[in-house]
């Protein structure tokens, strides 16, 4: 059935699967002891999360196109031994140099969702010529790794410098969608291989996961610059 399918193939718990299916058909699962106000807030939160997902997916597609348009970034990935096919499988992209590149992707660069999603940084204490707070892209001149939840939705990014620079890896900040200490990079693609193999390899970085997958080790995941937490372990059970 549909619930069993989501539990097996999306790694959801029974309750998560029920809520997900209900949301897809416009129903709301009653919460024990939840007031109407709490239910309304929960509905608004789900809507906000869906909107943020849309913003991040749009950015992911733009970064993928920018990778194809950047010989330097393509050469870097080839130098790391990665094929075009594996880059496509993982949705790798490139964030070009420039402080406001995403303004070409999102015409309304002042949209608050760009900050809430972690794509753009805003400095309230610095004002531009228009009197508004200064904004600029968080990720610049980096290989981009979309981070997806167990449903395959983009919830954030990891960006790696091409040359020397610090930090080598830059993650999305904490957002309504993304919590670094809870997520595992690559789990969305690795979940079936983990189940079939009966084991999982936990590595340090995004690039390790992609490289291992290219060489047939498809049951690898990476923590996002943190040690393995109880939340990570729970996702793998």
Predicted regions: what they are:
Residues 1-112, 116-121, 125-130, 142, ...:
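Non-catalytic accessory segments of DNA primases and related replication-initiation nucleases
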Residues 3-4, 15-19, 71-78, 150-156, ...:
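Short, acidic loop-beta-alpha module within alpha/beta folds
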Residues 132, 136, 217:
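Acidic, divalent-metal-binding catalytic cores of TOPRIM
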Residues 135-140, 197:
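Short loop/turn motifs at secondary-structure junctions and domain boundaries
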Residues 142-148:
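A short, hydrophobic, proline-anchored segment that marks a local hinge/packing element in signaling
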Residues 148-151, 165:
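Short acidic-glycine loop/turn motifs at beta-strand connectors
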Residues 162-178:
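A short, polar/charged loop-to-alpha-helix boundary motif
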């Amino acid at each position: 059935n549909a619930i069993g399918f989501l539990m097996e193939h999306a790694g959801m718990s029974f309750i998560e699967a029920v809520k997900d299916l209900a949301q897809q058909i416009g129903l709301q699962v009653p919460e024990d002891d939840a007031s109407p106000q709490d239910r309304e807030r929960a509905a608004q939160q789900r809507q906000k999360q869906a909107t943020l997902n849309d913003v991040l997916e749009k950015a992911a597609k733009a970064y993928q196109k920018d990778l194809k348009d950047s010989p330097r970034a393509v050469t870097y990935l080839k130098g790391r031994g990665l094929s075009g096919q594996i880059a496509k499988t993982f949705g790798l992209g490139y964030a070009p140099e420039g402080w406001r590149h995403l303004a070409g992707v999102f015409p309304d660069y002042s949209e608050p969702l760009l900050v809430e999603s972690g794509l753009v940084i805003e400095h309230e204490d610095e004002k531009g010529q228009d009197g508004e707070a200064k904004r600029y892209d968080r990720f610049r001149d980096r290989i981009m790794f979309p981070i997806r939840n167990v449903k395959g939705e983009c919830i954030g990014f990891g960006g790696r410098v091409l040359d020397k620079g610090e930090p080598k890896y830059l993650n999305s900040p904490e957002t309504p969608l993304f919590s670094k200490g809870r997520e595992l990079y690559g789990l969305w693609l690795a979940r079936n291989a983990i189940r079939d193999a009966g084991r999982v390899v936990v590595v340090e970085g995004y690039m390790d996961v992609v490289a291992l997958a290219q060489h047939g080790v498809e049951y690898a995941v990476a923590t996002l610059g943190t040690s393995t937490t109880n939340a990570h372990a729970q996702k793998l059970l």
